[in-house]
Amino acid sequence: VLPSESRNDLTAVNERPLRTPAVIRLLRPAQWLKNGFVLGPLIFSRSFVSQSAVLHSLAAFLIFCGVASAGYIINDIYDRESDRAHPSKKRSRPIASGEISVRVAIIVVSIAIPLLLAAAFFVSIKFLLAVALYLLLTAAYSIRLKTMPIIDLFTIASGFVLRVWGGAVAIDVVLSVWMFITTLSLALYLAATKRRQELLTTTAASEFRAVLQHYSVALMDYYSEIAVVATFVFYGLYIVTVRPQLAATVPVVLFGVFRYRYLMELSPIEGTMESPTDRLVRDPQMIIAAILWAAISVIVLYLEPS
């Protein structure tokens, strides 16, 4: 029979939540979901019927995952002091908490970026350009642009546009005007709702993200409403003028947007500091909606007469 102290120690260990290793948290794999935009051109250009195009798209997706992680590490290096002062989630980031030193983080980035650029070169020169621009944009955002109102939103949105353009040049197809405008509008919606959630989930939000002192919940609501309407208008025009068969995806898209906004409304009530992406990857309904949208799109476009 164990002494009471030992039993208490074992109970404490069993009740302690499992913690993801610091290296994995540093890379933020949950955020790789955003790189699904890289696969958009593969679907809408009907290039998924080509094995070569599929392989190039998957390579582009993986490279962007690596580049995105490098960008997050750069951001965490610059934000380590403010992250340490954060009242909740950010203070536990590996660099801010001291689990991974700045020196080690710099070494990781210094090795990863040249390797990723080399891999991008083997996909295509244009794809290398897309990756390089994304890296520069990410660095500029971390250093300065995230403190500039409005510009910060468009910088976030531009990152999504570069993902889509990268996916297009990786398989040597032209990025359509409709896809460009729809992606930009959708990304602005995501950026505005993200800022809105930050304003609601932190009592002194502007102390930890300076740009928030220039925003209000009402303003973010206004921006997100404009962006989501623009997204539906441009997506609808694309369907009507180019791919009428994709009308079958509209109910799924509507559900996805409604569900996303619903999830964003939950965070302030529950007092959590989850990012929007964290919520999406943990929500079964959003996962099913995304899979359903992709499946319907592929089936409809595959059955479309050549």
Regions found by a protein language model. Give the residues of each.
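Short, aromatic-rich membrane-interface segments at the entry and exit
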Residues: 52-57, 125-131, 149-153, 174-180, ...
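Multi-pass membrane catalytic core of lipid/isoprenoid biosynthesis enzymes
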Residues: 80, 85-131, 177-186, 225-234, ...
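Long, highly hydrophobic alpha-helical transmembrane signal-anchor segments
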Residues: 34-55, 145-177, 219, 224
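Short, amphipathic, aromatic/basic-enriched membrane-interface segments that mark the entry/exit
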Residues: 24-30, 94-105, 122-127, 145-153, ...
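C-terminal membrane-associated helical module and adjoining short loops/tails
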Residues: 1-24, 143, 161-306
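Generic alpha-helical transmembrane segments of integral inner-membrane proteins
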Residues: 36-40, 58-69, 110-118, 122, ...
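Residues within alpha-helical transmembrane segments of multi-pass membrane proteins, especially transporters
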Residues: 43, 70-71, 77, 81, ...
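Topogenic membrane-insertion module of multi-pass membrane proteins
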Residues: 2-88, 97-110
